[in-house]
């Protein structure tokens, strides 16, 4: 056990004291609101009750509860203690219904076995579980295993850590898949595959992109798990003595993990090509989103320090992805199409963006938000299509250079910048005209599409952090 975890050990008396205090807080809230309470905390075996991944999972449970009970929450209380973080929600609904919904949350998530969501009726009594908890290790009734001490504390610690790491890896791979699907269905996207047409591509369509997404998603989960396994030496996150890039000779990951990530990326490409019949739909996205997924998982595990409220997720994930990108070798004498274009035109493209922490993805995310605010959510074009223009106006897109040469790439930038300047006055007809022109010229800005997917991923990660801020405004 790390020195940090030893310092965070919680004793039996501390837990008992917290239980008494919690019961008093519950009775006080019941007296003030007269509504059933949904009480959320984590069920963690052993003396260490806090950790970056534990807190990450807690906020997953809280987000789920906030979404299910949306519009019915009349009060909210939050506790941040060494014994664990907790939340109480006063909900305007029948206690029996709330209990069923609480149990559905525990079943929905892979780490739901660690959620402890109690419902207290207006009579002050806790509603019983319909199905007893199962043991984390053997699947037998948890109460029986606890009484007989069937499993050691170390076994339970390892099982908990593995469950949390797998949950984080799976979650961020799902966000990556959502981002890819949202990107391909953003319409219109000049020169690119969308719901209208195949853009300047005659070998792919939206349906093929969906097949490709399904094929590569499992590899995003594998990448995140590789990164987490490499650095989560403590029970539930980074070890207490983790010191950033200095820990592994200038890289945020050890060389072995970097090598495994490269091999997983190659396997993802092979799976993509098998699914698409040899068509390159997502090679660039495997690179950019692979970095983003790993960065998001490492951030959840406390890579930048233990930040349980996870504010400014997009910026932090993008910055961490940039640090990860520095660990990879990008040989400029490679024979790939991208390397040839980089050498010919002296541009960095996606690699340069990755090492810089995806600045254009952050710009696109901001443009998407600004457009929705300025148009009051009633804009004449898809806000992500508008955001794409911000990427196209700035990115040294290897695909555009390959297909249109320097003159074609300059045309893309100029037209995109002009349309971007129209802000909410931009019309769909203008985007369609741009689309027609790029199709006529045979220019497809695949690098911009990959960057848009990264922006959508960062936006999805950011949205998850807003629930707590909204709940905090809820008072009795």
Model-derived features: positions:
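Long, contiguous binding/interaction regions
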Residues: 2-68, 97-123, 127-169
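Short, well-structured hydrophobic secondary-structure segments
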Residues: 37-93, 209, 214-228
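C-terminal edge-of-domain segments
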Residues: 81-95, 101, 109-110, 115, ...
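Catalytic cofactor-binding cores of redox enzymes
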Residues: 115-120, 124-133, 273-301, 306-320, ...
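Phosphate-rich cofactor/ligand-interacting catalytic cores and adjacent structured alpha/beta frameworks
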Residues: 162-235, 258, 296-436, 462, ...
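Long, hydrophobic/aromatic-enriched structural stretches that serve as scaffold segments
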Residues: 218-240, 252-298
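Short, hydrophobic/aliphatic alpha-helical segments
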Residues: 261-277, 428-441, 459
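Short, amphipathic C-terminal "tail helix"
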Residues: 440, 444-476
């Amino acid at each position: 056990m790390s020195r940090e975890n030893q310092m965070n050990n919680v004793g039996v008396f501390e837990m008992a004291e917290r239980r008494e205090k919690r019961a008093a807080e519950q009775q006080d809230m019941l007296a003030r609101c007269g509504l059933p309470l949904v009480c959320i905390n984590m069920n963690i075996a052993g003396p260490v009750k806090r950790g970056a991944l534990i807190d990450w999972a807690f906020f997953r449970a809280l987000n789920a509860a906030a979404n299910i009970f949306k519009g019915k929450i009349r009060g909210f209380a939050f506790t941040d203690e060494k014994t664990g973080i907790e939340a109480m929600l006063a909900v305007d609904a029948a206690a029996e219904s709330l209990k069923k919904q609480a149990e559905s949350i525990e079943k929905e998530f892979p780490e739901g076995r660690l959620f402890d969501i109690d419902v207290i009726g207006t009579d002050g009594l806790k509603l019983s579980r319909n199905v007893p908890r199962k043991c984390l290790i053997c699947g037998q009734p948890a109460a029986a295993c606890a009484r007989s001490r069937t499993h050691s504390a170390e076994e339970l610690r390892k099982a908990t850590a593995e469950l949390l790491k797998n949950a984080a890896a799976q979650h961020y791979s799902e966000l990556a898949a959502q981002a890819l699907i949202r990107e391909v269905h953003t319409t219109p996207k000049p020169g690119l595959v969308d719901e209208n047409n195949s853009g300047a591509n005659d070998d792919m369509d939206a349906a093929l992109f969906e097949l490709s997404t399904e094929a590569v998603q499992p590899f995003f989960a594998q990448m995140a798990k590789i990164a987490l396994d490499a650095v989560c030496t403590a029970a539930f996150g980074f070890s207490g003595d983790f010191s950033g890039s200095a820990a592994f000779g200038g890289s945020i990951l050890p060389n072995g993990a970097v090598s495994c990530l490269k091999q997983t990326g190659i396997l993802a490409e092979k799976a993509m090509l098998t699914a698409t019949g040899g068509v390159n739909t997502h090679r660039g996205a495997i690179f950019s989103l692979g970095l983003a997924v790993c960065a998001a998982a490492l951030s959840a595990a406390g890579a930048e320090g233990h930040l349980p409220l996870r504010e400014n997720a997009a910026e932090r994930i993008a910055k961490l992805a940039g640090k990860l990108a520095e660990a990879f070798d990008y040989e400029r004498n490679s024979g790939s199409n991208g390397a040839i274009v980089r050498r010919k035109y002296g541009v960095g493209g996606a690699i340069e963006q990755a090492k810089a922490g995806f600045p254009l993805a952050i710009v696109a995310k901001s443009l998407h938000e600004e457009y929705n605010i300025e148009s009051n959510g009633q804009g004449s074009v898809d806000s992500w299509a508008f955001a794409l223009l911000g990427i196209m106006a700035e990115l040294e897109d290897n695909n555009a250079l390959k297909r249109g040469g320097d003159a074609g790439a300059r045309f893309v930038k100029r037209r995109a910048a002009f349309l971007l300047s129209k802000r909410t006055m931009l019309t769909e007809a203008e985007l369609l005209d741009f689309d027609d022109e790029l199709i006529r010229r045979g220019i497809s800005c695949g690098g911009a599409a990959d960057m848009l997917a990264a922006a959508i991923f960062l936006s999805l990660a950011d949205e998850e952090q807003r629930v707590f801020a909204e709940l905090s405004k809820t008072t009795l």
